Structure formats: structure tokens, C-alpha cells
Amino acid sequence: MQFLAIDCRRPAIAAVAALLCAAGAWGDSGEAARSVAAGSTWTVEQTTQLRTLDIAPGASVIASGGRSLTLTVDGVETGLAAGHYAGDVRLTPTDNNIVKFGGGMPGGSELTHYFRQAVYLDAGGLVASKSALAAAGKVRLADGVVSGVRVRSVGENFNGVYVAGGHYTLASPSIYATGNGGNDFAGYGAALMSTGKGTTLIVDHAHVRTHGAIRTAVIANDGSNLIVEDSDIATFNGVLPADYVTNVTPGMMKDAPWMLGIRGNCRATNLLGNDTNATYINSSIAAEGWGVLSIDSSRNTHLTAIDSRISITGTSGYGSYAIGNSLNAFYGSTFNVADYGVIITGGNAVFGASTPATLRRLNDELKLGLSEPQLSAIKQQPTVLHSRRFGVMWHGDGSVKVGDDTVFDTGLTSFLVKGAGATISIDGTRGAQLHAGNGVIVQVIDNDDPGPVTVDGVMVNKGVYHEPTAAPEKLADFDVTQTHATDVVVTLTGITLAGDFYNAIRGGAAKGGAPAGMGSLGPGATGAPAGPGGPGAGGGPPPGMMMGGPKPASRNLVVKLVDSQLSGVIAASSAKHRKDTIGAEDYQLLGVVSNTPGAAVNNGVLVELDHSTWTVTGTSYLTSLSVGADAHVAAPAGHTLRLTVNGQLRPLAAGTYKGTVVLEVTPG
């Protein structure tokens, strides 16, 4: 048995020595009270316990040897500042935990953070010299299980549990943190964090609450494997510094980029670094704003939720963010979100049921370590996505796969694609359903993200969207009758569906996103892996911050029906926002458009029917229509359908029609 494997430095020695290290003494000279006068400096040599501490304005309290210093009052981590402190007052010097982040503009300076944490674990055990144990509760480590963690923090930039190596189970931790974090791209100030290849952290029955800007609840980083089970996690927005300027520079960004149509300043969780896995099982994860299950600065990652609740409790935010060829997979989970279920830029999302076969596959592929009784205890249920606005939004290339008995219930459009290539697969053979509140299943538009403005090397969120006024110009080298690798391709299989599909791409270059030539701030991405349970993907944009750069936006919408019945309009269109000029105050108007169907310019629409029926409910403008021998295209009862190709009336029969293809519906 390994019991409390800690020491004052390294290697581990007896538990008695560790406890002596943590206990400290009555002051450095035996006093129970200490006053630090203005202009003076008190250098703390060892863990020191007082009954009262007074720090005058202009005084300084530091740890010896350049180490970090943590103040606790009655076991609560407290910001070290001028003031009067009374009770069980402890000052704990700890060895520095230096974390560097290559944020800022390309070629910019590296950020260096000095993490402080209540509990620091590595492959050798609990490291007392890096742990502010006075803030940790009654910690016990036995046979790889860490129990007794109770962290209360009212200071800024304080981490709860930091695991950098080894295989640990964190049993029933309770963490409450109030105050802002420092950098959620690095995990600075997170309640729970795993980092490093070879690190596996199982968090079991955790209760975590944070209240502060970028005071993230959970961080998985740098190739670690994080598994969260039966836990309750929630974050709440904080108060931003008075001098903060909203921006999207990684490492400096402290609030959501409004150009995505969201607000808030604390992501509940963040997955970072290459080859990192994070899995949430039978857990509740909530954020007041911004996002719940986020990914950033990474590639080739897996973010999985099984039988979990994913919630935005405030007025704005998303359920999950897919970037850098990530695979974001949701099985038996329920979304209750304000703006988007998932946002995609370079990642892939899968929605399905928590079937026994799926669970066993995930257990192997993600190294979850679930026993047969644990697997059997997970109830099979569908994934249900409730969003007050959109289901999935793209502002970068990626794919979505919807299967089993998944239900999308959205106030607005099910799938909103902004100037990106997208692959959307909907398999209704097991009962999947899509309910769009505005009647639009797929909407393709140019990217209306106005992008930042660079001020003194910082990408400030001062961009403004302006509705184009000129008519789109036809691009001679773009074929609107053929499928391209960059198109939006929707495949409907075995589903009965009512709703419309619009392609309102204008063509040319999409405005917004990162400045030209910059892209994102990470290494180039490669194709995403094919598992677990999701499609592979082609090379995505470079990972990094949650943006994409300008790129050619001419693209077709391809809709394939296989063994399906669709009632609705499929058409090229022109789109118009509710306001011609959209700034930060109108952030929720981004992506909200009305459509006027019309002949395609750079926005081809190709429809393929295989053993399917399309009931055309309104005039539809296509560039290609392929009707299989066992397929049907018809008007609703009491209406007549007329087909013209390049202005010529044609009988509608099995075959392929290309050019300006118009299906006109009239009464009678």
C-alpha cells in the first residue's frame, strides 16, 4: 500500500516527515501574530501559522528563494494583499510550478505562469513541496486513490488539483473557487487539471463550482487521459478587470468572442494539447456563459460525453466546441443550451445512443478502465439536443454524424454553415429526428464573423459586420453543377423529415476570422482519426484560437436522399440579416437570416434521390437534379409541380438534369 507518498522535496520518505512539513510553526520566530509595516518586506522561510496577520499598504510578503507563496485563512486560499487576517492564518511557500504558454501573435513573447495549487501529483505521488496543503482539506493517498480533497479559494489564479503524471483516482473532491483565473489556454487557475502523456486522472463524484472570469472547472492537457464520472460541475461568469479590452489573442482572451454570436467569460471545461482525451460519464457539466465542453490549441483529440447533461444556465453560450481535427462524441447525453449545441471549426461531431456495443468500444478505444458491472450500470438512452437557437454551427470545415434515436430540437436552424465545407450525415433508420423551430434544416451562408482589429499586437474585438450591397459576381472557374471537396454535403438516410435547405453563399472570399495570412496560432492539422464512433475527416485548419482566416467561399450544397421522405424547399438563395450593420451589441443577429430563393450564381444546389420521395413545398432553384428509377418528386396535395431546365419546360421523370433547374409549385 502507498500511504501519503509525499515529502518536503524528493524522494518520498515517511508520512510523519510529510506531516511535519505541512504543519509549519507559530511564525518564523514563534509569534502568533505578525504585522508587516508599509515599505517593509517579510520573507517567509517555511510554512508559518499565525492567529493574526496585518499587512500594511505598501508592504510586501514573499517566500524565500523565489518560491511561490499561498495564504490560507481557516483553510480557505485567500489573495495575498494588504489587510487584516484573523483565525487559522497560514503562509505556505511552495516550489514553483512554472507553466509556459506560447500565446500572443506569431513571433510574440511567451507567457510564463507560476501555478500555485492545493494538491500537486506526479508519477511519484503527492508532492508536498509543490502543494499548498493548508488549502487542500484532509488529503489521503492510498493505492492510487486520492480522497479528502476539499478546496476553498477566494483568491485569483489558484489551482485546486494539478496532476502531471501517474494514474490516479480522485475520489469525491469538493472544490469551490471564487475569483478570476489567469489563462484558460494554459489551465491557470483551474479547479482540476491533468497534463502530460502518461497521465491518467479519474475524477469520481466530484462537486465543483467556480465563479470568475476564465476560472475553468476542468482542464485536460498535453496528451493526458481525463475521465470524469458521476460528477457535478458548474461555472459562473465573473467580473472582468476594469482595464480589460475584449480580444481573441490566445493567452490574453478572457471572454467569449462575440463574433461567434455568444457571450460569457468562463468556459466550464477546456481540452488542450495534442492527443488529449477527456471523457465525461453520467455527469452534469454546466456553464453560465461562453461554453461547456470546449477544445482549443490542439489537434487529434477526443472529447466524449456519455449519459451526461450539458447545460448553459445563462443567456448565451454553446455546448461544445470542435477544433483541430477533434472528435466530439455524445452518447446518451442531453444538451440544454442557449445558442449552439456544437460549434465546429476543423473538428467533427457525433451524436448517438449509449448502446452497450458503443460503450464497450469506447471503453477499449479511450482506455476508460470501466469494469463489466460499471458498463452494465450505464443506462442506454438517446442523445437529445435542446437549443434555444441553433443546433450545430460551422465557421471552419468539419463533419457531423447524427444516428440512433438522437433528437435535435432547436429554436432556429438545425445546421448553420458559415463559409465552410461540411459533411452532414443523418441516419434516421433507428429513429433520429430533427425539429427546426424556423423550419430550416440546413442554412449555408458566407462567414459573417467580422473578425478582430489588431491594436498594439492584440487582436481586439472591434470588427463590425456590414451586409454586402453589390450583386455577387459569377466566378468563371467554379462549376455549380459538380460536387467539390469543399462543398456542403448532406446525406439523409432512412428518415422522414420536414424542413428547408438553403445555399446563400455569394462567392469570392469569406470576410471575417483571422487576418489574411495568419490563420490560427497552432501547428498545421492532419486528418482526424476515424474512431471512436465517428467519421474521419480531411486535413483541417491549423488549430489554435477559435477562429479561421479568409478563404474562398464559393461552394455548392449537395443534398442526397436515400430511403427517405422529405417535405420542404431545397434552393439556392440570397440571404439577408435583420440589420445591415452588426456590432457587439447585436451579436445574436449574426447567423440569423431570411432567404429569397433564386437562380444560383456561385452557390450551386445538387439534389440526388435514391429510393426516396421529395415533396416540394415551394419553388426550388437547383443546378443539378438526379432522380433514381425508384424515386419520386411531387407537389403537395392540391398543387402542381413544373420542371424547367435552362428555361425550357421538361417532363419530370427518372434521370439527371443539370443547368438552371427550377421546380415551381403552384396551386391547382
Residue ranges of each PLM-predicted region?
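Gram-negative bacterial Sec-dependent N-terminal signal peptides
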Residues: 1-27
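Short terminal (N- or C-terminal) low-complexity/amphipathic segments
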Residues: 3, 520, 525-530
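N-terminal domain-start segments of secreted/luminal proteins
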Residues: 27-51, 98-152, 156, 180, ...
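Exposed loop/turn and edge beta-strand positions of beta-sandwich/beta-sheet ligand-binding modules
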Residues: 30, 186, 197, 274, ...
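Short, T/G/N/S-enriched strand-turn elements that build extracellular solenoid repeat scaffolds
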Residues: 31-36, 42-45, 49-55, 72-75, ...
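All-beta strand scaffolds that present successive hydrophobic residues in beta-strands
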Residues: 36-37, 42, 50, 55, ...
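Extracellular beta-helix/beta-solenoid repeat scaffolds
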Residues: 46-101, 150-210, 214-230, 235, ...
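Extracellular beta-strand/beta-solenoid scaffold signature
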Residues: 112, 117-135, 155-162, 183-194, ...
